Amino acid sequence: MAEALGLAGMTETPAVIFLGQRPGPATGLPTMTEQGDLLFALHASQGEFPRCILAPKTPDDAFYLTVKAFDLADKYQIPVFIMSDQYLADTQFTCERFDTSKITTDRHLVSDGELESMDAYKRYSITPDGISPRALPGQSKHLVVADSDEHNEEGHIDQTADNRILMMEKRMRKLKGLTMEMESPEVYGPREADVTLIGWGSSYGPIEEAVDLLNEEGQSLNLVHFTHIFPMKREEVRNILLNKGTTVCVESNATGQFAKILKTEADISVDVNLLRYDGMPFTPGYIIRALQEKKVI
């Protein structure tokens, strides 16, 4: 998968990768759950290129985020990860019928008319936003050329230093527009609280319920939950998380992977990591007991 991911990054081919996480390495715990592949999704394959990571919190969210993933992949010509896990896949939910009227499809291809008006077609044309015109092979009289080696605007191999800089910067410029399309994290509960729990992906339900149970007992907690993981809206995330009380990052992995992304992408350091990596999903009771053991509440 990592090799194919790099090929998509270099050829600027849209790709959506559904990554269903479970405990590894190797066969690991094949029927149990974990959130252990986040940093793999962020860094997999050789070299640097733009990518996007989304993590649905519910089946409803999975449906609509998948639609968004395909749109972003087509628009920015990048790989997009959808991070699920065994817990989200196996849990039974009752939800409203999906509203397909919200769905629009745009492959973001160059039109036949635009191609006919071009004297020459450059698949990797240098553009201000980094997005080059994408045509399908056979769509017009123009030749579509792609190569996994570094290439010039026409798609032919070019390994000169000047060309490498031009193409690398062109690809990375996509991150600016992509970041604008990311949604800020959801804040659940009171805006101001003594303790802020931070979660991502499928852990939303158990954390939400733990917040409700503790607030009913007179505690003061809220939840900041992420479904749009990367790229991150740095300033918006900082505005939400700075000057909070005690911050606790709740994750199903052994190393606090999302907390590391918060540090590198938003320069936010959490106070406490609440981690579970025994293959079982979070429950409200587990979260509450862990908060008590860590003397957070």
Where are these regions (language model features)?
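Thiamine diphosphate
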Residues: 1-43, 52-73
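Short, functionally important structural connectors and interaction interfaces within domains
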Residues: 30-33, 46, 180, 274
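Short, conserved catalytic or adaptor-binding loops enriched in Gly and charged residues
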Residues: 40-47, 265-266
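Glycine- and acidic
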Residues: 48-55, 192-196
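Short, basic, glycine/proline-bearing loop/turn elements
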Residues: 51-57, 219-224
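Flexible, low-complexity linker and terminal segments
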Residues: 65, 70-297
